[in-house]
């Protein structure tokens, strides 16, 4: 839908909640206003921005690491050292295993999720306007963490690591006993234990992904509502205070995702 065709606040809000989608059957862009979304579509805007932000993280940290000095650090080096120290302290406090992968993983998760969340602070119409008028894109959403597919995919990656460390530390037999003999240590309760432990295990990635998605989707929606329902001269009254408050939200959600990942992997790494 072109900007000139948007005549009501409802159309404006709906336009900004549509993803740029690729039909995997025809490999053509989907016009969200012509046909409803199906299973065989890929949200390429979410994929694009998540990959780009991941590359920004890698390039930025690599450049700072290559140019780091033992003397008085610059502002960027000092900021990155502060982030690394903060993440490392959390890993030392919460993870009691011996893996050397957890700290880099936690750092990657924290910075990557923060960068994806930070996209919510960009002017709501800036990148969609550029995409529509210069690239001819029918829709564009720029906050990857407001897409449930992205957050659940990240949570699925954490879930795979939970299973990996559980089996690595406890063995197949120990992990099986954990699923079948807890909380009731009697063979007659194996079906009940399996259901309870299975639900508990599956709830970890589901809650991890949906928590991040829900908070970021709500934040994005509030920005869209402010822009769509209020006249331009009064939008600053609400958007600026909400943006300031939203800085806390995007940082907190990145921190929570990181902390829960560390805790889940620490629990999986405990030997029984």
Swiss-Prot record:
<keyword id="KW-0997">Cell inner membrane</keyword>
<dbReference type="GO" id="GO:0045259">
    <property type="term" value="C:proton-transporting ATP synthase complex"/>
</dbReference>
<feature type="transmembrane region" description="Helical">
    <location>
        <begin position="221"/>
        <end position="241"/>
    </location>
</feature>
<keyword id="KW-1133">Transmembrane helix</keyword>
<protein>
    <recommendedName>
        <fullName>ATP synthase subunit a</fullName>
    </recommendedName>
</protein>
<feature type="transmembrane region" description="Helical">
    <location>
        <begin position="147"/>
        <end position="167"/>
    </location>
</feature>
<keyword id="KW-0375">Hydrogen ion transport</keyword>
<dbReference type="GO" id="GO:0042777">
    <property type="term" value="P:proton motive force-driven plasma membrane ATP synthesis"/>
</dbReference>
<dbReference type="GO" id="GO:0046933">
    <property type="term" value="F:proton-transporting ATP synthase activity, rotational mechanism"/>
</dbReference>
<keyword id="KW-0813">Transport</keyword>
<feature type="transmembrane region" description="Helical">
    <location>
        <begin position="101"/>
        <end position="121"/>
    </location>
</feature>
<keyword id="KW-0812">Transmembrane</keyword>
<dbReference type="InterPro" id="IPR045082">
    <property type="entry name" value="ATP_syn_F0_a_bact/chloroplast"/>
</dbReference>
<dbReference type="InterPro" id="IPR023011">
    <property type="entry name" value="ATP_synth_F0_asu_AS"/>
</dbReference>
<dbReference type="GO" id="GO:0005886">
    <property type="term" value="C:plasma membrane"/>
</dbReference>
<feature type="transmembrane region" description="Helical">
    <location>
        <begin position="243"/>
        <end position="263"/>
    </location>
</feature>
<keyword id="KW-1003">Cell membrane</keyword>
<keyword id="KW-0406">Ion transport</keyword>
<feature type="transmembrane region" description="Helical">
    <location>
        <begin position="41"/>
        <end position="61"/>
    </location>
</feature>
<comment type="subunit">
    <text>F-type ATPases have 2 components, CF(1) - the catalytic core - and CF(0) - the membrane proton channel. CF(1) has five subunits: alpha(3), beta(3), gamma(1), delta(1), epsilon(1). CF(0) has three main subunits: a(1), b(2) and c(9-12). The alpha and beta chains form an alternating ring which encloses part of the gamma chain. CF(1) is attached to CF(0) by a central stalk formed by the gamma and epsilon chains, while a peripheral stalk is formed by the delta and b chains.</text>
</comment>
<keyword id="KW-0138">CF(0)</keyword>
<dbReference type="InterPro" id="IPR000568">
    <property type="entry name" value="ATP_synth_F0_asu"/>
</dbReference>
<dbReference type="InterPro" id="IPR035908">
    <property type="entry name" value="F0_ATP_A_sf"/>
</dbReference>
<comment type="function">
    <text>Key component of the proton channel; it plays a direct role in the translocation of protons across the membrane.</text>
</comment>
<keyword id="KW-0066">ATP synthesis</keyword>
<keyword id="KW-0472">Membrane</keyword>
<comment type="similarity">
    <text>Belongs to the ATPase A chain family.</text>
</comment>
<dbReference type="Pfam" id="PF00119">
    <property type="entry name" value="ATP-synt_A"/>
</dbReference>
């Amino acid at each position: 839908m072109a900007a000139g065709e948007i005549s009501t606040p409802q159309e404006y809000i709906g336009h900004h909640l549509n993803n740029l989608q690729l039909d995997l059957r025809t490999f053509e862009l989907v016009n969200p206003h012509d046909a409803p979304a199906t299973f065989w579509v890929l949200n390429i805007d979410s994929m694009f921005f998540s990959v780009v932000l991941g590359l920004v993280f890698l390039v930025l940290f690599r450049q700072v690491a290559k140019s780091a000095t033992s003397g008085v650090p610059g502002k960027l080096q000092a900021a990155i050292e502060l982030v690394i120290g903060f993440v490392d302290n959390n890993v030392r406090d919460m993870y009691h295993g011996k893996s050397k992968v957890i700290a880099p993983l936690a750092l990657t998760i924290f910075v990557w999720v923060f960068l994806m969340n930070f996209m919510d602070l960009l002017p709501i119409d800036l990148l969609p306007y550029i995409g529509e008028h210069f690239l001819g894109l029918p829709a564009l959403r720029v906050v990857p963490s407001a897409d449930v597919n992205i957050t659940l995919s990240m949570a699925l990656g954490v879930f795979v690591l939970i299973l990996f460390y559980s089996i690595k530390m406890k063995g197949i037999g120990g992990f099986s006993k954990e699923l079948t003999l807890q909380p009731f240590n009697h063979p007659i309760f194996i079906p009940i234990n399996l259901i309870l432990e299975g639900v508990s295990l599956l709830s970890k990635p589901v809650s991890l992904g949906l928590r991040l998605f829900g908070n970021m989707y709500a934040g994005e929606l509030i920005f869209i509502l402010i822009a769509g329902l209020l006249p331009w001269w009064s939008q600053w009254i609400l958007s600026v205070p909400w943006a300031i408050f939203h800085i806390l939200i995007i940082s907190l959600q990145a921190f929570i995702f990181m902390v829960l990942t560390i805790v889940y992997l620490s629990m999986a790494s405990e030997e029984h």
